[in-house]
Swiss-Prot record:
One Pfam family named in its UniProt record: NUDIX
Enzyme class name: hydrolase
Source taxonomy: Bacteria, Pseudomonadati, Pseudomonadota, Gammaproteobacteria, Pseudomonadales
Start and end residues of each Nudix hydrolase domain: 6-149
InterPro entries: Nudix_hydrolase, NUDIX_hydrolase-like_dom_sf, NUDIX_hydrolase_CS, NUDIX_hydrolase_dom, RppH
Gene3D superfamilies registered for this protein in UniProt: Nucleoside Triphosphate Pyrophosphohydrolase (3.90.79.10)
GO cellular component: cytoplasm
Species, as recorded: Pseudomonas syringae pv. tomato (strain ATCC BAA-871 / DC3000)
Protein name (record): RNA pyrophosphohydrolase
GO molecular function terms attached to this record: mRNA 5'-diphosphatase activity
Function text: Accelerates the degradation of transcripts by removing pyrophosphate from the 5'-end of triphosphorylated RNA, leading to a more labile monophosphorylated state that can stimulate subsequent ribonuclease cleavage.
Documented EC number(s): 3.6.1.-
Any one GO BP annotation for this protein: mRNA catabolic process
Keyword Ribonucleoprotein: no
Family, as annotated: Belongs to the Nudix hydrolase family. RppH subfamily.
């Protein structure tokens, strides 16, 4: 499902622990790290997609997390030209994302990245809240900055 402007609707997931750290996941067979994210299917709400992607990518269920906040609007990034599939119709030039800030309320041993036949990640770790800004691929950096900045006050006020 791609919107008329060429952006694919997507959810981004910032999962925090009680220490305020965030889950940082390594793409399978790559030295590339990112937050879990994934597309919103037709007839799915962003929250529905959040829970589906959370389960597919990190093995967590609805009862394992608490939603602390969600970005107010869509945050967009364009794909680098080398990643645009120019022969696909409709043409997808990037992603538009709703970002969710979650708190893990279950034990971290519940995090599993091998529950699907095609896992997206092969490792993870807890990192400081702002660490991802210096590590994520360049074309996603501004969206990460905007999401982290908008959601940070909710992390600090959660107690």
């Amino acid at each position: 499902m791609i919107d008329p402007d060429g952006f694919r609707p997507n959810v981004g997931i910032i999962l925090t622990n009680d220490a305020g750290q965030v889950l940082w996941a390594r793409r399978i067979n790559q030295d590339a790290w990112q937050f879990p994210q994934g597309g919103i299917n037709p007839q799915e709400t962003p929250e529905d997609a959040l829970y589906r992607e959370l389960n597919e990518e990190v093995g967590l269920e609805r009862h394992d997390v608490q939603i602390l906040a969600c970005t107010r609007g869509w945050l967009r990034y364009r794909l680098p030209q080398r990643l645009v599939r120019t022969h696909s119709q409709p043409l997808c030039i990037g992603q538009k994302q709703k970002w969710f800030l979650l708190r893990l309320i279950s034990n971290e041993q519940r995090v599993r990245m091998d529950l699907t036949g095609k896992p997206e990640f092969d490792g993870w770790r807890w990192v400081s809240y702002w660490y991802p800004l210096g590590q994520v691929v360049t074309f996603k950096r501004e969206v990460y900055r905007r999401a982290l900045k908008e959601l940070a006050p909710r992390l600090l006020s959660r107690d």
